[in-house]
Amino acid sequence: MGHFRLVYQDYHLDLPIEEPRITLRASSGSSPGKELEDDVVLDLEVKSPKFFFDPNNDPEDDVAQWLNPGLDTQWLKIPLKHFENGDYRSLQKIRVDFQGEGTRNALTGEDWWEAPGLITTYSDEFFTRAVISMNYDGDGRFSVHLSGATQFDTAFDIAFSAPLTVKLVGYRKTATADELLSWFDRFLSKEDFNLTPTQRGEDLYLDGAAKAGR
C-alpha cells in the first residue's frame, strides 16, 4: 500500500506506484581521488507508468504532454553519527526537513548546498522543500513518507514501503570486497545483510538486502 500524489500544473494526480526502492549507496573511484566517506546516500526511488497527460482532452493543448513520473533522492547523505549501535532500525529516527538551499541541514549541522532529491514529471524537478520520514515495519522493510514542492511548483505527497537494500561500488580497483564490507560495517552490522560481490571489469559491486527476521 502507498500513494504517489502530485499537484502538477494545478491538476491533482493520484498515480500508481511501481518499483519502490529504499537503498543505501556508496562508492569509491567514481571520479579521480574519490574515496569512501563518513556518510552514506539514502536513495529513495519510486516510479509510475509513463502516460499522456491531457486533462482537457485536447492533444494540442499547451498542458498536454507525456509524463514519466518518478522520485529519486540520490543526493541525500546520512552521516555516520546517525547510525546507532550498527542497527538498521535506527534509520526510523532519521527525519529530513529540507527548506531550500542555504537553510540548515539538521542531519549534518551545516547548510544544505544542494537539493537532496527530485521529482520527475515532463522533466526533472528538484526539491525546493521536502520533509521525509521513515518507519521500520519489521523483516528488513521500511515505510517512507515524503511531502514537499519542487522548483516548478509541483507539490508531492508520496508514501511507499520496500525492503532495505545496499549498493556499494569500488570503481577502477579502488576497493576490495573486504574493504567495502569493513567500511559498511562502521554504519550497520554487515551480519544483518545478505551481500553478494560481482566483478565487472575493474569495477566491484557489492549488492544485497537486509535479512528478514532481524
Locations of regions flagged by a protein language model:
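Intrinsically disordered, low-complexity regions enriched in small/polar residues
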Residues: 10-13, 90, 100, 124, ...
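Intrinsically disordered, low-complexity terminal/linker regions enriched in Pro/Ser/Gly
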Residues: 176-214
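Compositionally biased, low-structure terminal segments
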Residues: 5, 25, 52-54, 143, ...
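A short, surface-exposed beta-strand/turn
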Residues: 152-180, 201, 205
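Short, well-ordered strand-loop elements centered on a beta-strand within folded domains, enriched
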Residues: 37-39, 141-147, 173-183
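An ectodomain-focused feature that recognizes extracytoplasmic/extracellular
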Residues: 1-119, 204-213
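Acidic, glycine-rich flexible loop segments
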Residues: 90-167
